[in-house]
Amino acid sequence: MENSVAPFVLYSGTEPRTPGEDSLPLPAEEEGAASTAQTPCSLSASLCFSSGDDSPPQSRASAAEGSEASPPSLRSDLRVVETQWDVSSAASPESPEECARPEEPASPEDPPSRHEHARPVELESLDELGEPVPVPPGVGSVHGEPDLVIEVAGRRLRAHKAVLAARSDYFRARASRDVLRVQGVSFTALRLLLADAYSGRMAGVRPDNVAEVVAGARRLQLPGAAQRATEAMAPQLSLDNCYEVLSAGKRQRLTELRDAAYRFMSDHYLEVLREPAVFGRLSGAERDLLLRRRLCTGRACLLAAALGTTGERSGSRPQSPSGDAESRGDAAVYCYQAEAGEWRELTRLPEGAPARGCGLCVLFNYLFLAGGVAPAGPDGRARPSDQVYCYNPVTDSWSTVRPLRQARSQVQLLALDGHLYAVGGECLLSVERYDPRADRWTAVAPLPRGAFAVAHEAATCNGEIYVSGGSLFYRLLKYDPRRDEWQECPCSSSRERSADMVALDGFLYRFDLCGSRGEAQAAVGSGGGVSVFRYHCLAKQWSQCAVHLRPPGAPAGLQPFRCVALDGTIYCVSRAGTWRFVPSQDTEAGSDMGPGGSFEPEPLGSPLDVRGVLFPFVLNLPEKPDRGEQGAV
C-alpha cells in the first residue's frame, strides 16, 4: 500500500525572501523544528507548500484583499493564521500589514466571527429610551449597576435581576443568566412592563398597544401589570375603538381586555345601542351580557327627584302650565343612604330641564325626564316642553335624546319592553313610543275619547300599561302593546283621592287618602289616613288591603305622596317622611277578604327643606365609597 504524499509545488525565485515580507514569521525556538518537519527537501521553506491548494503563495496584503471574496471557511482558517502571527509578533513594532487587516466583515450581510461575539457592546439603559422610567428611591444604591441584559427585537435593555425576580416567576427562574433573549414580546411592551416593574405605575398604554402589553405581561408572568395596563387604558376607550379592543381581547384570549370592553359598553349602553358599527357586530349572547351587566351591576338604591309644585295636585286636576316658571333651585335628585339613615344629594337637574309637570321613569338603569313646563318665553307665558333628558348613574352625567313629537305637560312617562311611552298630558290623548336603538319617537294608539283630561297615575304590569284618572269617578285603562289598543278595566269602589298607583308581583296597589273629599274625615279624625286597594291583573279583580291606616310619625295633615316598589316593599315618599308598606301574602289573590298589609313602625325620614313633590324611583348605583356626598341634605 502506497503512502499518499501531499504534492509539492515549487516556484522559482530570483532572490531569497526574508521573514516578514511574503512569508509568515516563526518563533525563534520553533524555527529549526519547523524547517525540519515542513521541508523534506533542500529548498527553503518559503518555496515549499504542503497544502493541497494549487494556488501560488500570497503575501499578507494580498490575502487581506482577497478575504472578502473567499468563502467563510477559508477566511476563518486565515483568521487563525493571522492570530498566530499576532501572537508571534506582539513585541515587534506595528507593520503596514497590520493596518490592512480587516477588523469587521466588509459587508453587513456577512456573519460575524466568534471573536466579534465576544466584543463588548454598548447597551441601552432604561433612562436612554426617550421617556424617563420612574424608579423608586434607593433602587440604584441597593442593587448597584444593572446586571441583566434583555434582548428583544434586536434591541437591548439593562435591568436588575433582583428587581425583576421579585415580581416575576419568569425572571426568577432565569436569574442565573446575564443575557436573556425574550421572544413574543415587542420592544415597546417590554419597556412599559419594565417601567411598571420598577415603579408599580403603568404609563404610555393606549388602546392600540394594550393588547401587546397585556400579552407580554402574561408571557413574562407579571399578573399585576396586566390589570394595571387595562386600568390605564380604560379611560381612553370610546365608541370608535371599543370594538377593536374587544376583538383583540377575544382573538388573543385576553380576559382583561374583554372585560374592559364589555364594561365600557355596559356603562355607555345607550350610545352603544345606537351605534350600528358596534352593536350590530355583537352576537346575541354578547348583547344579553351587556344588558345583564347594566341592570345587575351595583346596588339597587332608593332615589327621589324633587320637582316643581306643578306636579302636586291640590284638586282633581293639575295646574295649568300658564304663569311664570318657578325657581329651579330645588330641582335635584336625592339618594337614601341606608347606612347613615339620611338622604343625600346625588345630582342636580341639567340646565334647561323643566322642573315642573314633567314625567320620569327608569329604562336600562337610566333616568329619563320628558316634557314639563318650559320656562317663560319673551311674552312671559310658559309653554309645554318637548325636551327629553337622560341621566347615567354610572358616569354621573346628563345627556339629551330626541325630543317628543308633541310638547306635553303633566305627561305620564313609562318604560316597557325596552321602549319609553309618553302617555297623554294636559288636554292630550295622544301617546308616543320611543325606540332607543333607532332614537326615534313614533305615534301609537291614543287614549279613548272621553277618557280623562289628565292621566293621574300610571304603571306597568305583566307587559301592559295601566292608566288611572278621572274627575268625578275613576277609570282604569289598559294598553296592550302587542295589539296596540286600549281596553277598559274594572275600577275600584273607592271614591277617595288617589295618592299613587304602583305595580308589585302581578298586582296594582292603589293608595287613597281618606277624608280628602270630606267623606271619611269624621271616621279617621282631623288627620285622615290611607286606604290601600290592589288589583289582580290576571283575575281582573279588586280587593282591599288596608283601611284607614295611619303612617307612623305622619303629621296631622297627611300630605300626598308618591310610591315605588323595591325588594318586595312599597316605599311611600313625601316631604313629611318616607314609610314602608309591606303587603301580606296570607290570602290568595282574588278572594273577597283582603290580603292585609301594614306600614313598618320606623319611618325613614325625608330630605329636609325641599319644596315641591318628591318622585321616588330605583336605580342601581355603582359601588363607590362616599358617592353623592356633596353634603348631607
Swiss-Prot record:
Keywords: Kelch repeat, Phosphoprotein, Repeat. SUPFAM superfamilies: Kelch motif (SSF117281), POZ domain (SSF54695). Signal peptide: none annotated. Residues 61-73 have a biased composition (Low complexity). Pfam families: BTB, Kelch_1, Kelch_6. InterPro entries: BTB/POZ_dom, Kelch-typ_b-propeller, Kelch/BTB_domain_protein, Kelch_1, SKP1/BTB/POZ_sf. Residues 146-206 form the BTB domain. Residues 35-60 have a biased composition (Polar residues). The modification Phosphoserine is found at S70, S73, S92, S95, S107, S113. PANTHER family: BTB_2 DOMAIN-CONTAINING PROTEIN (PTHR45972), KELCH REPEAT AND BTB DOMAIN-CONTAINING PROTEIN 11 (PTHR45972:SF3). This is Kelch repeat and BTB domain-containing protein 11.
